[in-house]
């Protein structure tokens, strides 16, 4: 057993982002850090189809999407499948805490993104985590709010 090391539960990430540059950056940052990027999309319907067909450990999603649906609705559908969502958004939205594991406020740095994913991973394992600047953690997946 390695002391100080946690078993990583977040390995496969779906990125749902309507800003192309942000999506590209997130994909590269997380991919370079060793995460498997299942897909990157800007559309609710595509994201929903992906979570129905492929294993996903975490969705990193903006709340605003290029469709009539939004990230809150996606997180609700994902939660029903046992998949946690971390919002990455520039605005706080009512109801976000009911469906997501947390919210990372834009703009954020590469370091903040990686730290946020690490904190979410530990939070999902039930660890007590101090949120870094810009990250608000909500109740862990599966807990009732």
Residues of each region from the PLM?
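Two-component/phosphorelay signaling modules centered on CheY-like receiver
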Residues: 19-39
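A Lys-centered signature of the CheY-like receiver
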Residues: 106
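Conserved phosphotransfer microenvironments
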Residues: 61-79
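Acidic, metal-coordinating helix/loop segments flanking the phosphotransfer/catalytic sites
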Residues: 27, 40-58, 66
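Conserved phosphotransfer cores of two-component systems
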Residues: 52-54, 77-83
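Short loop/helix-cap segments at secondary-structure boundaries that form the rim of catalytic
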Residues: 93-101
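Non-catalytic signal-transmission and effector/linker regions of two-component phosphorelay proteins
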Residues: 1-12, 110-145
């Amino acid at each position: 057993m390695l002391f100080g090391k946690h078993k990583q539960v977040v390995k496969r990430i779906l990125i749902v982002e309507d800003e192309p540059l942000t999506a590209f950056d997130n994909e590269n940052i997380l991919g370079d850090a060793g995460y498997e990027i299942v897909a990157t999309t800007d559309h609710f319907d595509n994201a929903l189809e992906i979570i129905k067909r492929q294993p996903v450990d975490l969705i990193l999603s903006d709340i605003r999407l290029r469709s009539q649906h939004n990230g809150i609705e996606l997180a609700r559908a994902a939660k029903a499948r046992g998949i946690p969502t971390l919002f990455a958004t520039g605005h706080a939205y009512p109801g976000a805490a009911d469906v997501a594991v947390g919210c990372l406020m834009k703009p954020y740095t590469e370091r903040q993104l990686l730290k946020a994913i690490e904190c979410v991973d530990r939070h999902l394992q039930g660890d007590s985590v101090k949120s870094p600047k810009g990250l608000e953690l909500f109740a862990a997946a599966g807990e009732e709010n």
